[in-house]
A protein has these predicted regions:
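Active-site-proximal alpha-helix that buttresses catalytic centers in soluble enzyme cores
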Residues: 1-296
C-alpha cells in the first residue's frame, strides 16, 4: 500500500492555537506586541487559517482520485512542520495502516531547501525500511503549468482591456546567498516563464515578497511602483511558491498590493490560488501516478 505524506507549514485549529504555533516557529515566546499583531492578522482573514482549511481537503481529494481505479490502495496523510500532526505522527500513522512505500509531496511546486524541500530529506532519513519517493519540482509538469496558466489568463483578461498589463509572480524572499539561492531562483524564474508562455502573457517578471533588507529583490510592491512609472497601469499578482495561501501570501500579494495599486490609480487583480480545486487535484494526482508509474 502506498502512503502519501502531504506536507505544509502548519495548521492552527483555533485562534487559541496561534501563540503556540508561532512559539514553535521562532523557538521562543513571541513578545506581547508581536503576538498581538500576529493574532490580529489571523482575525483579519475572516475565515479559519487557509492551510488549516485546504490541506485536509487536498489530502481527501487526492486519496479519492488515486483510489478510483481500485487496483491498489492509496492513503494520504497530512504532515506539518509547526503543528500536529507532525512528520513523525504522519509516518507512524502510515506504518500503523500497513503502508509498504511512501511518497512525499509538499504544497510547494518549487523545491526550496529551506522550505518544504527539507521535508523530503527528513522522511528519507527517518524511513529506511521501505521505499520513499519524493515528488520535487512538480512545476515542470505540463498539467501543473496548464492549471496555473488558466488562472493567470483569467486574472489578466479581467483587467481593463485597454490597460498596459504586467504579471508579477511571487515567492517568499530569501537572505542573499548565491550558492543557496541559485536553484531556488532558477526554478522560480523557469516556472514563471512556463506559465506566462502558456497563458500568452508577454510582460511578466519574477519578484519577491516577505523580504527584508539584504534579501532577494525586487519586492513586489516596489516592482508595482517602478512599473507604473514605466507606463504599466494594470497588474496581476500570482504566487508560485505554494498551491495554497498562507497568512503572509494572503495579505502581501492581495490586500497590500491592492493598496499600492489604489494609491497609484492603476488596476489590480490577484490570480487565484490552486487550493483544492478540481483541476488542481487531477493535475497533482496525475503527477503522482507518473512518478509512481503503473503501480497505482
Amino acid at each position: 500500500m502506498l502512503g502519501i505524506l502531504f506536507y505544509a507549514y502548519g495548521a492552527p485549529q483555533s485562534i487559541d492555537d496561534v501563540p503556540a504555533y508561532f512559539e514553535h516557529i521562532i523557538g521562543r515566546t513571541p513578545p506581547a506586541p508581536m503576538m498581538g499583531n500576529i493574532t490580529q492578522q489571523f482575525k483579519d482573514l475572516q475565515t479559519a487559517d487557509p492551510i488549516t482549511l485546504y490541506a485536509p481537503r487536498i489530502a481527501e481529494a487526492l486519496e479519492t482520485v488515486l483510489n478510483q481505479d481500485g487496483a491498489n490502495t492509496v492513503r494520504v496523510y497530512n504532515a506539518y512542520k509547526h503543528t500536529a500532526p507532525f512528520t513523525d505522527d504522519a509516518i507512524q500513522a502510515a506504518r500503523a495502516d500497513g503502508c509498504t512505500e511512501l511518497l512525499t509531496l509538499t504544497v510547494n511546486p518549487i523545491y526550496s531547501a529551506s522550505g518544504g524541500g527539507s521535508f523530503h530529506e527528513e522522511v528519507a532519513e527517518k524511513v529506511t525500511d521501505m521505499p520513499v519517493i519524493p515528488l520535487k519540482n512538480y512545476y515542470e509538469a505540463a498539467s501543473i503549468v496548464e492549471m496555473y496558466a488558466r488562472r493567470v489568463k483569467a486574472a489578466y483578461d479581467f483587467l481593463p482591456r485597454e490597460a498596459t498589463k504586467k504579471v508579477l509572480y511571487t515567492v517568499h524572499s530569501q537572505i542573499v546567498d548565491p550558492e543557496r539561492n541559485a536553484p531556488y531562483v532558477a526554478a522560480f524564474e523557469a516556472f514563471a516563464k512556463l506559465v506566462s508562455e502558456k497563458a500568452g502573457v508577454p510582460d511578466f517578471e519574477a519578484v519577491y515578497r516577505s523580504g527584508r533588507k539584504g534579501w532577494l529583490d525586487p519586492d513586489v510592491k516596489e516592482a508595482i511602483r517602478r512599473d507604473t512609472a514605466a507606463g504599466f497601469d494594470g497588474f496581476v499578482t500570482c504566487e508560485l511558491l505554494s498551491i495554497v495561501p498562507d497568512m503572509e501570501s494572503f495579505f502581501e500579494i492581495g490586500r497590500d498590493c491592492k493598496a499600492v495599486c489604489e494609491e497609484l490609480q492603476v488596476a489590480f487583480v490577484q490570480s487565484e490560488f490552486i487550493g483544492d480545486s478540481f483541476d488542481g487535484m487531477m493535475a497533482l494526482a496525475n503527477e503522482i501516478k507518473q512518478l509512481h508509474y503503473a503501480k497505482i
